[in-house]
Amino acid sequence: MSKKVINVVLKENIQKLGKSNDVIKVASGYARNFLIPNKMAAVATNGILKQQKFYAAIREEKLKTAKENAKKVKQLLEEIQRFSVSKKTGDGHNIFGSVTEKEISQIIKNTTNIDIEKQSISLPDVKTIGIYDVEIKLLHQVTANIKLQVLPESN
């Protein structure tokens, strides 16, 4: 006796099955008794498949636009290349506190008028005066690399 399988469209990401909006084949009992009642999937009818294609085209266009914008921002940030911040220093080259992602985000906003989320900024521990490499993840595949120069604050 063979299993009956049906095509369903996933409404959310399900581990080991697929991502949201994927069309997959599952056992009809699994679909009827679990996926569909829990609103995790819908039966893949012709209307739903057309709707999927339409929304996929819209998502693709939005992604393309976002990627172009991210590349423009990357080019702008890498043209500037170095951002500076002044911090109070103690003995030697040690600074009081450290430089945070929020501060870098604010410096970039003040300089270029571009909002960068602090979660997308990756930097090493900044505890001394010097130049540091900072990586900014603008999009899944687009990252900008800038230099952060930490200077002693003049009294």
From Swiss-Prot:
One of its GO terms (biological process) is translation. It comes from the Eukaryota. It is found in: Plastid, Chloroplast. Signal peptide: none annotated. GO terms for cellular component: chloroplast; ribonucleoprotein complex; ribosome. The keyword Ribosomal protein applies. GO terms for molecular function: rRNA binding; structural constituent of ribosome. InterPro entries: Ribosomal_bL9 (IPR000244), Ribosomal_bL9/RNase_H1_N (IPR009027), Ribosomal_bL9_bac/chp (IPR020594), Ribosomal_bL9_C (IPR020069), Ribosomal_bL9_C_sf (IPR036791), Ribosomal_bL9_N (IPR020070), Ribosomal_bL9_N_sf (IPR036935). Its main location: plastid. Keywords: Chloroplast, Plastid, Ribonucleoprotein, Ribosomal protein, RNA-binding, rRNA-binding. PROSITE patterns: RIBOSOMAL_L9. SUPFAM superfamilies: L9 N-domain-like (SSF55658), Ribosomal protein L9 C-domain (SSF55653). NCBIfam families: L9 (TIGR00158). Binds to the 23S rRNA. HAMAP family: Ribosomal_bL9. Belongs to the bacterial ribosomal protein bL9 family. This is Large ribosomal subunit protein bL9c.
